[in-house]
């Protein structure tokens, strides 16, 4: 009897130095999949992900930027997904946070492999070229992963204080389990780093990240809609669940499908 499984797709920040060579170590036999993602890169004059993955040294200024990290993560995740034994596991739904939502669309079949590669590459490039601000992660749990109400209250008070400062812009970016991710402009990031309580790891600024999921990136929305065609989106064959529990279901027309995906991601 098959086990039922929910697949959670990774987002940005999941291809680090330890992952260099991941495709060759774990998925060398999936050359067709890698070639499909490479083709999306070659079409836009970018370095193929196979070349980035096979580099002799991990270079943060190359491997961590959105235009390169995004398609690298996409290729690794899609190869992992393809490796799941469907005779053992019945995948009942897929989900993902942030960039992981794009990957979830591809895993669900709403985007095919090439369409997903184009979407991820387009969005990674846009964020790299036109992104603004950044993100900071701070925990709202203790060492035993127990929610600390005083930490939640501290963040609320900090955000209220920030609203009264006209020279900074700070927003809640993601409520990520036991972490709060804050998005801000450069002045806001500096302000947060000076005020958030520190330990040996946090507050942590996410390098090469823009102020994702905040009004600071509203200017990218019309560009993204123009660069990503509705015709790439299909019916899919696995439910795609958003972080709010909304399920991406087949719609009657291409336009309705594309709008459903837009609304679900928002």
Predicted regions and their residues:
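Gly/Ala-rich beta-loop-alpha elbow adjacent to hydrolase catalytic centers
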Residues: 77, 92-100, 104, 108
